[in-house]
């Protein structure tokens, strides 16, 4: 039997729209993608809303996209799960929240809420903060609760933070500190950023600003500093995190929250996030008897109780391949490495048989418009070598550029990012063709195709647009579908029967 190879290349954040103005995908010169779309079967997929397990109209994201891609079924997301708990009131009897409340009362200490304050729905949601505050008011802890607000400006408008701050103040929150997500939610092991936030939260090592909070935020805007990049500052020194306190980390998505959560709960484990085995975490004050609740399970390193356990997904794509004794490779740079591993594997840290992983470090730049190529060239070099070795039966590869550079809001840089990916994609696919394999090309959500909003301001968030799906097999005809249909399609190309747990369907309508 001839060995078959199928490679999946994920063009992160590359959606489709008929709107051509300020559309980086349309404006970029992409001769190879143009060639693929002209010469090979292709279709469009839904990558947002209910089709990926999110509320109707909710934009997709990389975590959700990769979960659905790898699971081969619609994966109902934490956002949907938590929203449902608020509606049916089970949120207010959640055992873990009540344990945190009891801890505060027993120790006569403080309650802290921290997380990303926006309604972007990618990492957190403002409604969850409000529901928690309602619960704390019911338990007479409102006056002893402090909010540590991480401003967004990435999944939302760059200057929307001031409105979220006002909303929360009007709701009754006591905001003790503020910092942009660039510092608080770094996922590229920039521990100097995490250190700044940790020491602000615990040791008063940040400016204490007495101005009205909204005026302070406006001052940042006046200096050209958007929500994402607001530097740490304290508004209420009495609201710092101390021994015996309780913390509820309101982010439900783990990948950007896990480092700060580890620093708070298990600082000795911060080394686990560094490939060289040594972190630069240096918290001034280590906390004792801290009770930490995370909305979902962040990682094995985070010592917390988990408010909402995730549904266990069985027989995902990677497991099917491994159980058949086949070899697979996952490759991405730091920014998207968790997505081709943890998220593609159903939100689990799996050690699959015959599964290799290659992590390419992301460039150490403040924002990726400064290096729109990111690490795509290095990924391409390693991928080509691996494919041509003949060792592997399947490959999962992510090019982060359209999404990560698209998030900066800079059109020219995003165009360059897409052009880089186009040339790299050609090299990867030529290697696949050399081993007589087939390639699937997909995006996990939209972003780079819309670089401005309706008012002409930079649009740095994801979109709800359809995404492309291409199969380099001229003997098939494809039908439209959703991200959950990609894994069944890949199994179909490998002539492997999909497991019954995969409720997605092959997108191959018929053989020509």
UniProtKB/Swiss-Prot annotation:
Highest taxon listed in the record's lineage: Bacteria
Tell me which Pfam families the record gives: iPGM_N, Metalloenzyme
Which EC number applies?
A: 5.4.2.12
- Residues involved in Mn(2+) 1 binding: 403, 407, 462
Which of this chain's residues are annotated to bind substrate? 123, 154-155, 181, 187, 253-256, 336
Record text on cofactor binding:
Binds 2 manganese ions per subunit.
Q: Which UniProt keywords apply?
A: Glycolysis, Isomerase, Manganese, Metal-binding
What GO molecular function annotations does the UniProt record carry, in alphabetical order?
Answer: manganese ion binding; phosphoglycerate mutase activity
The entry's active site is 62 (phosphoserine intermediate)
Q: Single GO cellular component annotation?
A: cytosol
Q: Which InterPro entries match?
A: Alkaline_phosphatase_core_sf, BPG-indep_PGM_N, Metalloenzyme, PGAM_B_sf, Pgm_bpd_ind
What Gene Ontology biological process does one annotation of this record name? glucose catabolic process
Q: Which cofactors are required for activity?
A: Mn(2+)
Q: Which reaction does it catalyse?
A: (2R)-2-phosphoglycerate = (2R)-3-phosphoglycerate
Pathway involvement of the protein, from the record: Carbohydrate degradation; glycolysis; pyruvate from D-glyceraldehyde 3-phosphate: step 3/5
Q: Which CDD domains match?
A: iPGM
Name the residues that bind Mn(2+) 2.
12, 62, 444-445
What HAMAP family is this protein classified in? GpmI
Complexes and interactors? Monomer.
Annotated family: Belongs to the BPG-independent phosphoglycerate mutase family.
PANTHER family of this UniProt entry? 2,3-BISPHOSPHOGLYCERATE-INDEPENDENT PHOSPHOGLYCERATE MUTASE
Q: What does this protein do?
A: Catalyzes the interconversion of 2-phosphoglycerate and 3-phosphoglycerate.
Identify this protein by name: 2,3-bisphosphoglycerate-independent phosphoglycerate mutase
